[in-house]
Amino acid sequence: MKSKTKNRTILVVEDERPLVQAIETKLEKNGFDVITARTVEQAARYLEEINNIEAIWLDHYLPGDKTGLDFVAMLKSPDSKWKKLPVFIVSNTASNNNVRSYLRLGVSKYCVKADHRLDEIVTEIADFLDNPEK
Amino acid sequence: MNEEKKIALKLEILAREKEAIRRKLVITARQLAVTAKEKESARRSLVVTARKLAVIAKEKEVARRKLVITAKQLKKMSETLENKVLARTKDLEQIRSRTEAILTSIGDGLVVVDKDGKISYINKSFEEMLGWKSGEVLGKSMVQVVPREDQNGIKVLFEERILTQVLSGQKFVADLTNPFYYIRKDKSRFPTSSIVAPVVLGGKIVGAVEVFRDITKEKEIDKAKTEFVSLASHQLRTPLSTVNWYSEMLLAGDAGEVTSNQKKYLEEIYRGNQRMVELVNTLLDVSRIEMGTFIVELKSTNIVRLVRSVVEEQKPQIDDKKITFLSSFEDNIPLMQADPKLLRMVIQNLLSNAIKYTPDKGRVEVSLFLDNKKNVILKISDTGYGIPKNQHNKIFTKLFRADNVIGKDTEGTGLGLYIAKSIVEQAKGKIWFESDENKGSTFFVVLPLRETRK
């Protein structure tokens, strides 16, 4: 486990309560400050209000009208101020079309929840943030 | 001369003249007799001729009478025949219009072509579905009038059209697994399912009949099914992820130390859940294959490296069962055009089967070699339980598991080989095996290299 002088803030957008709890615990144990949101609208509001968010953990299917894909499209639009913010899609909907759309939009990683250990995903995110150009 | 002498002389002259006349008369009489005879014979022959003529006349009369009768009969017969023909024509007309009405009213598109593939009949549904009028297409080539393309909009070549194949005497083909599309007159398209059958007359193919229908509805249902499966799998995966992550965290001591006994139980939960995840993934793969939503992404693929990494991944199982493992790879196997993810699934399935169905201390061999520089062959053999002869033909069937392994303590869904075969065939390869019960099995996969240079 890496020791950090300063904690990184990550926004976790996930609606499944037990999963949110597990993700939050694991991320905190790995030196992250965690903000959680259940919907795209809520997440967008937090982004506006909190300015030290360094990464986003995002699910695909979310309550409300908007999916993770809509959120990423907004984040990665040409005039967005969050264009460079790394986005990690952690979802169980591995439809090929969705994966492709996410990657085309420029997300940093896509992984299927059921196929990965939680600590694997957290470590990967931490590594990515440590070496962003990799 | 005296008078007496003169008279005597005159008398003598007279007598002579008389004699001459008498002679002449005798001659004439004779001549007359001859003429009379000739006349008699002529008369007789005339009588004969007259009699003959009478006979002929009689015969003629008989013949004439006969002719009159025949003519009457002929007339009668012709009348009957005419009536019959009329009736028959009416019947035929009725049958024809009935057939026409039936063909016309068939809800499916119908086209009849001659031996050159030229259209000789189309029905109303054909006109409605494709936008062509009968008059515009009769005598034209069906293959040209109605282009056919696959899912990706790639035109089916003339020689690959079922119609062409059927007309050339190849066995009747009906490929219902790969959906294709017919292009309308206005260039729009619709998914079609069609059946083509040859028309055989006197042992010769004289044409073909094609019946096709618009399967837009079926496709929509199919799509709904795909969406349902995708959604259901999403729903299944969420609780599975919860169990996964929490047992993982418990095992990692995130909620405090666990005793070794608790750890054992947690590991069972974790493993059981892991199997469930794999099962859901496999089911997803199967539904993708069946719905044709398997997206194939061809890349330059190093198959040797792929096999090595699968072997590496399954090393723990190999070691667990103390299996002797051998591998050999031919040098210079080039990069090939393949979907590495799918290819990996094939290798994984075959290798894990070999390990799973081989008892402890058995032997598993993997080799890769080239064939004619065009194909790469993957051979995986084991000294395992083998496949009973009477089940050889079922081994690639979905959900099928051979009798001899069901009883053994092995996990399996009966989906692995089904998936492997679907992938290999999709890649235009072949898969087969040789197996003897209790001696082992050898699986072969031949894949086209579709070589790419670096």
Named regions from a protein language model:
Chain A
Residues 1-11, 116-134:
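Non-catalytic signal-transmission and effector/linker regions of two-component phosphorelay proteins
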Residues 17-36, 40-41:
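Two-component/phosphorelay signaling modules centered on CheY-like receiver
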Residues 36-55, 63, 120:
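Acidic, metal-coordinating helix/loop segments flanking the phosphotransfer/catalytic sites
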